[in-house]
Amino acid sequence: RRRRKQPVRRALVAWVAATDALPILSSLIGALSRDNGPELMYLYMWLFWAWIVTVPPRLAFYAFNFVNLRRTGYVAACAFVLFALWGTTRGRTSIRVNRVEICSDRIPEAFDGFRFVQITDMHVGTLVRPERELTRLADSVNAQRPEAVFFTGDLVNIRAGELDERTTALLRRIAGPVWSVTGNHDVGTYIKDSLRFPAAGEAREVVARQRAMGWTVLEDTTVYLRRG
């Protein structure tokens, strides 16, 4: 029996060591990679997913098992795995609309009933299913029947190439005038290979591709809206 259990134990030890080493592996890949484009970001995402569904559940089991609550440990570990799976699938892509009524004496009466939508942080370069996710987002925005849409930064994750023709075509589905500003991800802050992809050039390209979609990009600019 001991001999039969040895291969199982060895496999278990190897599995534990491999999953524990995933953060180290990610760090090594990042250190050795010349660039950090979308492909590398996807790899990071999958490595993190593999870690989150293995190591924290195992630690939860260890904690309960330490106080002689093994069954509770199994339940806690399984619950954590299910929660992580939900978070990385349904939870990550769920859209929640928060409706806020703004009342102020500084708002002209002409804007009574004015409806706008504010969206932010799309990070289109790391969407798992861009077509489905951006279509749902556009439909959700359009369903609010806004008179204006404000995008408040971080359209891309790393660089301008993430705004390819397919992505921009999907974003054009957002109805109504769209005003946007750039975020820290949009201006090349996190580009690693800055020789091939200079931050200033990438920032200009992100702005240019937004304007090509019909968006109004505000760069140190003030715009006054008039109604009625």
Where are these regions (language model features)?
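Non-catalytic terminal accessory segments
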Residues: R1-T93
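N-terminal signal-anchor transmembrane helix
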Residues: G37-Y44, L69-Q144, T221
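Generic structural motif
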Residues: L59-Y62, F66, D105-I107, I119, ...
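Soluble catalytic domains of enzymes that build or remodel membrane lipids, polysaccharides, and related
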Residues: A110-G228
